[in-house]
């Protein structure tokens, strides 16, 4: 029984250390965008705007599929 508990504690410690390391070293999406050069940031913002418009169209299509009576 002692070996099982010891193994669980070590396993949790290793996984916890890995998770903490990941959280501390991975930058947030905003930080990545802010670190981009101005031309790439402008391109990113333009693509983001295009994606939001496309998502709006897809949302309208999904709504039309759910409620076909509201099309007229």
From Swiss-Prot:
Single Gene Ontology BP term?
mitochondrial respiratory chain complex III assembly
Q: Where in the cell is it found?
A: Mitochondrion inner membrane
Fetch the Pfam families from UniProt. CBP4
Membrane topology label: Single-pass membrane protein
* InterPro entries, alphabetized: Cbp4
Q: Where are the transmembrane segments?
A: 8-24
Which GO CC terms are listed, alphabetically? mitochondrial inner membrane; mitochondrion
Assigned keywords, A-Z: Chaperone, Coiled coil, Membrane, Mitochondrion, Mitochondrion inner membrane, Transmembrane, Transmembrane helix
Membership in a protein family = Belongs to the CBP4 family.
Q: Give the function comment from the record.
A: Essential for the assembly of ubiquinol-cytochrome c reductase. It has a direct effect on the correct occurrence of the Rieske protein, core 4, core 5 and apocytochrome b.
What is this protein called in UniProt?
A: Assembly factor cbp4
- The organism encoding this protein is Schizosaccharomyces pombe (strain 972 / ATCC 24843)
């Amino acid at each position: 029984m002692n070996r099982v508990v010891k193994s669980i504690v070590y396993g949790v410690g290793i996984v916890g250390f890995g998770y903490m390391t990941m959280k501390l070293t991975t930058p947030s999406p905003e930080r990545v965008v802010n670190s981009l050069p101005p031309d790439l940031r402008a391109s990113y913002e333009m693509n983001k705007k295009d994606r939001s418009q496309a998502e709006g169209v897809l949302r309208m299509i999904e709504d039309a599929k759910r409620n076909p009576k509201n099309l007229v």
